Swiss-Prot record:
It catalyses: Catalyzes the rearrangement of -S-S- bonds in proteins. GO terms for cellular component: endoplasmic reticulum lumen. The lineage of its organism: Eukaryota, Viridiplantae, Streptophyta, Embryophyta, Tracheophyta. NCBIfam families: ER_PDI_fam (TIGR01130), pdi_dom (TIGR01126). It comes from Ricinus communis. This is Protein disulfide-isomerase. It holds the Pfam family Thioredoxin.
Length: 498
């Protein structure tokens, strides 16, 4: 009996602890400065706020766990701001909230969105991830998109020598030009700082003759400032985006250059990248000639980057480049085409870029060396043999695109070996593989987004992606269903005619 009573009291004790824990968790939730949103209250809550920040998170996400105390602390700071700023969160991993995650294009965790005007305007959060930084960034974001500059002292405060700052000069703060400028400032405020003034004399390098309307963009590189007088919204936005980039983006170990490198690779223009040893003998001459080329082709749909070999190893691996080709220049277009000039001299740069612009340069293709021996059951394909083995062989080819580090590819390898052995006596069938990390793939034919990806190309040119189970029998069934037996039929028809 005593043992039974002891068990009862133990259960009561455990249940009491659980109740206390639940109560503490509920109390913590109640005291939180961060609003908890879900599919039932999201739209209604957002519609009531002119400015609100929403974190889309997943409970299992390590980065989300790290952000949580900082986000909570920032919310506590911001709720006592002159104009309170509201921070909220949504568990995007919850089934009921996944539609919200899709609606707001959430592709990773945590993702923070700034919602203005009751959710009508949506911007990415691009600020720090620690409490004080979050608070300061959002204080600026919740204020006016552009600050009025009333004195030289104010201008010096806002316009530093190490950042980009855009100022609109106007004869009055009204009219179409002013409204369009403010519209662009509001749209781009997450990326740039904006100001406006009635007197250009307040500005660095300001001239008393400038009365506006004019937009002046200050930057810590190239010509230091540039003016623009077209107040069409699209034209003004394009001016800000293009003028805030260096004529030549520098890719090295300096962190201050990294934002420009990111913008460079996000640009829709063709990208010319010159990689060299920054300490090499001809470095200064190459840099000078490259700058000249950048100015020569500015605004012609091509942007330029100058990369130090030591900082560019990732790019070398991606493009299949070798250090003995340095100095080199490679151009990549939006459709994936690449053009390479290796071991260039300073005087080679301008003529080669001109030839590229005129369509006179042959495309470059990243390829592993052609194997000297290729007698295994599964044939090795590289970019330089893709045409011969897959497209022009007149055979039915099953081709696996793999990555050497991919676990699923390693599991598939012995299965493909078995399939290949099964077709050893069938001359019309080829089982092959291509390392997609070391060879360029024609994206207009094969859509490779993960590994392994398997395609089948029939002898007559029909291409089908395999999405069945990765078993020997299923793969063979797929091949038999899609193979082209026209050659065999023609042979049979020829015998009948005889």
């Amino acid at each position: 009996m005593a043992s039974f009573r002891g068990s009862i009291w133990y259960c009561i004790f455990v249940l009491s602890l659980i109740a206390v824990a639940i109560s503490a968790a509920e109390s913590e939730e109640e005291q939180s400065s961060v609003l908890t949103l879900d599919s039932t209250n999201f739209t209604d809550t957002i519609s009531k706020h002119d400015f609100i920040v929403v974190e889309f998170y997943a409970p299992w996400c390590g980065h989300c766990k790290k952000l949580r105390p900082e986000y909570e602390k920032a919310a506590s700071i911001l709720k006592s701001h002159d104009i309170p700023v509201v921070l909220a969160k949504v568990d995007a991993n919850e089934e009921a909230n996944k539609e919200l995650a899709t609606q707001y294009d959430i592709k990773g965790f945590p993702t923070l969105k700034i919602l203005r005007n009751g959710g009508k305007s949506i911007q990415e959060y691009k600020g720090p991830r620690e409490a004080d930084g979050i608070a300061e960034y959002l204080k600026k974001q919740s204020g006016p998109a552009s600050v009025e500059i009333k004195s030289t002292e104010a201008a010096n405060t806002f316009i530093g020598d190490k950042k980009i700052f855009i100022v609109g000069v106007f004869p009055k703060f009204s009219g179409e030009e002013y409204e369009n400028y403010m519209s662009v400032a509001d749209k781009l405020r997450s990326d740039y700082e904006f100001g406006h003034t009635l007197d250009a004399k307040h500005l660095p390098q300001g001239e008393s003759s400038v009365t506006g309307p004019v937009v002046r963009l200050f930057k810590p590189f190239d010509e230091l400032f540039v003016d623009f007088k077209d107040f069409n919204v699209d034209a003004l936005e394009k001016f800000v985006e293009e003028s805030s980039m260096p004529v030549v983006t520098v890719f090295n170990s300096d962190p201050s250059n990294h934002p420009f490198v990111i913008k460079f690779f996000n640009s829709p223009d063709a990208k010319a990248m010159l990689f060299m040893n920054f300490n090499g003998e001809a470095a200064d001459s190459i840099k000078s000639k490259y700058q000249e080329v950048a100015h020569q082709f500015k605004g012609e749909g091509i942007i330029l980057l100058l990369g130090d070999v030591e900082a560019s190893q990732g790019a070398f691996q991606y493009f299949g480049l070798k250090e003995d080709q340095v100095p080199l220049i490679i151009i990549q277009t939006n459709d994936g085409q690449k053009y390479l000039k290796a071991n260039l001299e300073p005087d080679h740069i301008a003529p080669w870029v001109k030839a590229y612009k005129e369509g006179k340069v042959q495309a470059y293709r990243k390829s592993e060396p052609i194997p000297e021996v290729n007698n295994e059951p599964v044939k090795v394909v590289v970019a330089d043999t893709l045409q011969d083995i897959v497209f022009n062989s007149g055979k039915n080819v099953l081709l696996e695109f793999y990555a050497p580090w991919c676990g699923h590819c390693k599991q598939l390898a012995p299965i493909l070996d078995e399939v290949a052995v099964s077709y050893k006596s069938d001359a019309d069938i080829v089982i092959a593989k291509l390392d997609a990390t070391a060879n360029d793939i024609p994206s207009d034919t094969f859509d490779v987004r993960g590994y392994p990806t398997v395609y089948f190309r029939s002898a007559s040119g029909k291409v089908e992606q395999y999405d069945g189970d990765r078993t020997k029998d299923d793969i063979i069934s797929f091949i038999e269903k899609n193979r082209d037996k026209a050659a065999q039929q023609e042979s049979a028809n020829g015998k009948d005619e005889l």
